[in-house]
């Protein structure tokens, strides 16, 4: 496992950063902590995982995907203006869709089915790793309870997602003959949705984080979100790669 460093650009300063300096500090968080650096993702993208290990990833990731609308709805309910609510409401539509069978959650279920999982089992979330449940639920709670500025800042991992999506799609298509473009259809819309969402969230954070304390808080919020993503992969690696200690009640691959 790689070791996270405790310091990030912009982490310790008692002066107000310019908006561009703040953006640079936020991007430095991703350069150091985003989960594309995790060994599990390298194995996934390089074709080094078994079908069962990929199934474990898809199953556990579903809990994260299905919880995104919950965290967005929690934040949406606290936004003070119609303009902000309209902007944030698009995220709910992206994931929940406008009718049954549409939206990101439905596409992720198709991905899970495409790698050999039963959709009803995935939706039940019965086979989740405990760490997956704890990490994702902590993120939903963070967005429900933290100041709006910090909750919005925590979404800025999307600054880094287009790169990992391209790596994931190209790597999985090249290395797993049982994965198709249809299986990975979840990711194509995210290549346009994520940058659109970032444009709003980053502009909001740069405008409203005006004091040293606020700026450090938004950097910490992004670090927290990176930790949420990283910890999920730690659990997958420990349970399904090495040492392979699957917790009681969690999904056990057949292959």
Swiss-Prot record:
Oxidoreductase listed as a keyword: yes
Enzyme Commission identifier(s): 1.3.3.11
Reactions that this protein is recorded to catalyse: 6-(2-amino-2-carboxyethyl)-7,8-dioxo-1,2,3,4,7,8-hexahydroquinoline-2,4-dicarboxylate + 3 O2 = pyrroloquinoline quinone + 2 H2O2 + 2 H2O + H(+)
Pathway assigned in UniProt: Cofactor biosynthesis; pyrroloquinoline quinone biosynthesis
Biological process terms in GO annotation: pyrroloquinoline quinone biosynthetic process; sulfur compound metabolic process
Keywords: Oxidoreductase, PQQ biosynthesis
InterPro entries: Haem_Oase-like_multi-hlx, PqqC, PqqC-like, Thiaminase-2/PQQC
Highest taxon above the source species: Bacteria
A GO molecular-function annotation: pyrroloquinoline-quinone synthase activity
Signal sequence bounds: none
Transmembrane segments: none
Pfam family membership, one: TENA_THI-4
Functional description taken from the UniProt entry: Ring cyclization and eight-electron oxidation of 3a-(2-amino-2-carboxyethyl)-4,5-dioxo-4,5,6,7,8,9-hexahydroquinoline-7,9-dicarboxylic-acid to PQQ.
Similarity field: Belongs to the PqqC family.
PANTHER family: 4-AMINOBENZOATE SYNTHASE, PQQC-LIKE PROTEIN
Cross-referenced NCBIfam families: PQQ_syn_pqqC
Protein name: Pyrroloquinoline-quinone synthase
